[in-house]
Amino acid sequence: MITGIQITKAANADLLNSFWLLDSEKGEARCIVAKAGYAEDEVVAVSKLGDIEYREVPVEVKPEVRVEGGQHLNVNVLRRETLEDAVKHPEKYPQLTIRVSGYAVRFNSLTPEQQRDVIARTFTESL
């Protein structure tokens, strides 16, 4: 169990009025803030704190969502035939806008190679 404390009495003056998180299961203390001698987030054995007195302080734990890497999806809702026709007849599709790597671009502003690449990557037979 994690308990938040403020040290009110200690032989080591650096500990006085410092805040810690005590992990009773591991026998460890994590420094939240101290005047000197201890770094923020430094973890020490509770026994290293020596003979101390403290008062408990409320600890609020907020769930943290960690995203590493992530996913990215571009959705273009149209038919393959529309893009192929836009390659052949760009004048018919001056406003045709698609998503490429998160950006909206006019299909006609892409090079022919980029247009072919978009068509090849956008339409697949199966996943």
UniProtKB/Swiss-Prot annotation:
The modification Glycine radical is found at G102. It comes from the Bacteria. Pfam families: Gly_radical. The keyword Acetylation applies. The keyword Ribosomal protein does not apply. GO terms for molecular function: formate C-acetyltransferase activity. InterPro entries: Auton_GlycylRad_Cofactor (IPR050244), Form_AcTrfase_GR_CS (IPR019777), Gly_radical (IPR001150), Glycyl_radical_cofactor_GrcA (IPR011140). The modification N6-acetyllysine is found at K48, K88, K92. Residues 5-127 form the Glycine radical domain. Keywords: Acetylation, Organic radical. PANTHER family: FORMATE ACETYLTRANSFERASE, FORMATE ACETYLTRANSFERASE 1. This is Autonomous glycyl radical cofactor. It comes from Shigella flexneri. The gene is grcA.
